[in-house]
Every structure is written in C-alpha cells, then in structure tokens.
Amino acid sequence: GGLRDLHELMWTSRVTHGKATLKDLTEIGAIPERDAKAINAAYDFLTRVRNEIHFLTNRKSDLLSLDLQQQVARNLRYADTPEQQASELFMHDYYLHARRLHRLCETHLQRAAAKQEKTPEKKSWFSRSRSSSRIAPAIGGFVMRDGELDVADTNETLDGNRMMMAFSYAQATGANLSSALQETMQAALPSVNKTFRSSPEAAQAFLKMLRAKGRVAAGLRLMHELDFLGKFLPEFGRVTCLVQHDLYHRYTVDEHTLRTIEALDDLANSRSKTLERYRGVFSQIADTATLHLGLLMHDI
C-alpha cells in the first residue's frame, strides 16, 4: 500500500507534464515543496519497510503480514512501551505514511485531470475532454464546477468557519471537493486552533452535521481525509492510524470508528424489513448528534 500511488503519480506526470521526478515537478510548480517533502518522507519509510520484508523472507515479497510486523518493527528500531507493542507503534507510522502518500497523490492526480480538461486540444488517455465547465451559482462563496465544490474566489484564504461550511455543503449535496479547494484547506489547517475549537459557531456547525441522519459518516470521513477532523477534535487526532492488536479491532481505531458510524447511516437509509425494528427505534431519537458524538468518541 502506498508505493503504487506514487508510481501512478509519476506515470501520469510524465504524460501531463513531460516530467517524471518530484524534483522536476516541484521546479515547474506542479507540486508544492511541502507536498514533495511529505511524499519523499513517505517513500523513504515505505521503501525501508519493503526492504526489511525482502531481507526477512529472503525473497521478493511485498506482503507485510501480521507475523512479520513485530520483527520488521524491531529491525527499524521500534521498542515496546508500557502502553503499546513495538509492532503497534510501527504500524501506526506505516499507516500514517501510506495514508498521507495516498491523499497527496490523489490530490495531484485530480489537479492533472482538471488541467487536461481545460486543454482538450492535448488529448490523451488521461483527458476526459469536456467541451465546457458546468458552473452552478455561488452559494456562501462556494460554487459547483462539474459536480465538485470549489471556492468562487480562487484567491480566497479560508479559515476554520469557512472550511466547516464547505464540509457542510459537501455533506448535504454529496459533492466532492475540487483539488484546488482541498489544497486551500490544507494550507489553512493552522487556523483550526484552540480559539476556533472553542467557538460556539464551530460547535453548532459540527453538531448540525452530526444531525444529518444517513449522511454523517460521509461528512466526517471527508473531514478526516483532509486532516481537519483530527485538528478540530484533538482526541480523535491521537487515535488516527492507531493500531491495537486485539480481538476487537480489525482496523485502525479511526477507521473502525468511521465504519461504526457508517453502519448507523446504512441503518437510516435501509429499507430492509429485517432491520425495520431497529430503524424504528433510531427514528424515535429526536437529536442524533449525541449518539453520533458518542460513537465518534467511543474508543478514545
């Protein structure tokens, strides 16, 4: 996991920019320097992990199976702590790097696709060649461009409240965020600070999203993918990519939590007769924000 994301980015960059190295892409402004550094750090970590797997298995195997994780962790100088095993600490870092690499590569692939759409004369396998962009009227400073939410003013600097508004719109409409908006949000994450977290406006906006029956997990997952959720709720940030080798957690704690809320969304949207009783009980809850917040925090 992870390395193939980078390979795809490099292959695509050769087609769209004629460049196939991060250094070249940074120099022409295709990738911000901060993203290139994060990609390089993730690539370095994942390559060392793959090499350790090859050394331990004495063959070209890229499968990081459970029985190898503890020894790979030891070889990479991880040690047990009173709270966690070395393998859990190692896998936490592994998932962080793989997650970051996937998100960064996905963002830049979206940007490359958008660039190709704007220059249909340069047709390639990567271009969808739309004849024109479809733009919906602006609402609250945001617009819909070809089904993606974007800022109406491309020079706007977002703050925490504006980002919360964007997530709320995306949750309500089911729209994706444009690559440009995602990058703008990444740059604005420092504004998600203690002052913003403590504001009544932020609390009310977040609780409103938790009351959107059947759509809660989608909004939270989008927040999480862009690192907003962990900044807004530092307690959740601390369990991001947290691995627990026990009988209860097949996934990392953050993924386990989001899947739990997705199960509740599935119940709200279900028409199955076998779930009718549970759906009826759920429909009687006047304010589901407390329930969703409890699920969000149940493993913290």
Question: Which residues does each PLM region occupy?
Answer:
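Core mixed alpha/beta domains of very large multi-subunit molecular machines
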Residues: 231-243, 256-258, 263-266, 270, ...
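Histidine-centered active-site/metal-ligand motif
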Residues: 245, 249, 255-256, 298
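Non-catalytic interface/linker regions that flank or bridge core catalytic/transmembrane domains
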Residues: 1-249
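Histidine/acidic-rich helix-loop-helix segments that form or flank divalent-metal centers
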Residues: 243, 247-249, 272-287
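Structural motif corresponding to the C-terminal cap of alpha-helices
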Residues: 14, 174, 268-272, 299-300
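His-Asp-centered metal-binding catalytic motifs of divalent-metal-dependent phosphohydrolases/nucleases
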Residues: 6, 49, 223, 260, ...
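Alpha-helix N-cap/helix-start motif at coil-to-helix transitions, marked by capping-box chemistry
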Residues: 16, 40-43, 251-254, 258, ...
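Helical catalytic core of nucleic-acid polymerases
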Residues: 197, 201, 207, 227, ...
